[in-house]
Amino acid sequence: QILTGLFLAMHYTSDTMTAFSSVTHICRDVNYGWLIRYLHANGASMFFICLFLHVGRGLYYGSYMFLETWNIGVLLLFAVMATAFMGYVLPWGQMSFWGATVITNLLSAIPYIGSDLVEWIWGGFSVDKATLTRFFAFHFILPFIIAALAGVHLLFLHETGSNNPSGLCSDADKIPFHPYYTIKDILGVLLLILVLTSLVLFSPDLLGDPDNYTPVNPLNTPPHIKPEWYFLFAYAILRSIPNKLGGVLALVLSILVLAFIPFLHTSKQRSMMFRPFSQCLFWILVADLLTLTWIGGQPVEHPFIIIGQLASILYFLLILVLMPITSLFENNLLKW
């Protein structure tokens, strides 16, 4: 991602007049520019798929008991989401502009300082030149901060050693990383590259929005403003609350709730490997997130509104109430 981004930055201009045409120029005139651009855009999607799988794996096997590692992971998730959001603004298409307008506007819900804060971030009275330039600057610097944080993430993991599916100590079963884990990891990497190259070479625009191929027009709002697929679940939660501040809080909490999970762990066992009821709830949570992702991409009308509201309630209910109670029930089941 950093490499493709670097090569894109060599040809990109962060000025409102030329940003859109510079991206077009990259795709048409730069040698393999189309490849670099689509590797970067779809690489972000693959990145998020990996992140979601990684977080899900951590939830399932109780890896969140490594507090420092887990909290840095949550911080990393926020940083990656911020980076992806700012990157989406750079091509300066319709969805870039209106996405930036809608999401930055959410900050105006903050009491007292809200509207000043939004204008400060915009660098004016609307999303304009100053906004695009600073988003480019932040989009360039953040991945390096993320890389550094990932190093710290690993540092704290190595303090404890990694977890395993059983949730038990595996010190006695340790084997050399190379060749065993290296060869195992190469398989996953190859599968990942296969999916990425298939996406890039066969249907590069599958996950994108056609509205972003229309240059910015501040006077014309697209019929359905929606983010990239990996933000749709959070967007659905945001939209399911009629109050602006409430929606913003729910949006932040939808990710921040991950930080509370270690304190909601009531089970005597670390992993869900031997806890069938918790497993069931975990997969309901996955289904619920897929439902939210679907709802986030739908227009705000019946029956999508009520489905989104129910899915949002279920999301928080599962994590904050049902899973901890089920864990206690399972403890009693085993007479612990």
Curated annotation (Swiss-Prot):
Domain of life: Eukaryota
Residues that coordinate or bind heme b b566: H54, H153
TM helices/strands, residue ranges: 1-10, 34-55, 70-90, 135-155, 183-203, 245-265, 277-297, 304-324
Cofactor binding remark: Binds 2 heme b groups non-covalently.
Gene Ontology BP term (one): mitochondrial electron transport, ubiquinol to cytochrome c
Gene Ontology MF annotations: metal ion binding; ubiquinol-cytochrome-c reductase activity
Bilayer topology: Multi-pass membrane protein
Residues reported in the UniProt entry to bind a ubiquinone: H158
Keyword Membrane: yes
Keywords associated with the record: Electron transport, Heme, Iron, Membrane, Metal-binding, Mitochondrion, Mitochondrion inner membrane, Respiratory chain, Transmembrane, Transmembrane helix, Transport, Ubiquinone
GO cellular component terms, semicolon-separated: mitochondrial inner membrane; respiratory chain complex III
Positions with a binding annotation for heme b b562: H40, H139
Co-factor requirement: heme b
Subcellular localization: Mitochondrion inner membrane
Keyword Membrane: yes
Pfam families to which the protein is assigned, alphabetical: Cytochrom_B_C, Cytochrome_B
Quaternary state and interactors: The cytochrome bc1 complex contains 11 subunits: 3 respiratory subunits (MT-CYB, CYC1 and UQCRFS1), 2 core proteins (UQCRC1 and UQCRC2) and 6 low-molecular weight proteins (UQCRH/QCR6, UQCRB/QCR7, UQCRQ/QCR8, UQCR10/QCR9, UQCR11/QCR10 and a cleavage product of UQCRFS1). This cytochrome bc1 complex then forms a dimer.
Family: Belongs to the cytochrome b family.
More info: Heme 1 (or BL or b562) is low-potential and absorbs at about 562 nm, and heme 2 (or BH or b566) is high-potential and absorbs at about 566 nm.
Function of the protein: Component of the ubiquinol-cytochrome c reductase complex (complex III or cytochrome b-c1 complex) that is part of the mitochondrial respiratory chain. The b-c1 complex mediates electron transfer from ubiquinol to cytochrome c. Contributes to the generation of a proton gradient across the mitochondrial membrane that is then used for ATP synthesis.
Name recorded for this polypeptide: Cytochrome b
Species this chain originates from: Sorex pacificus
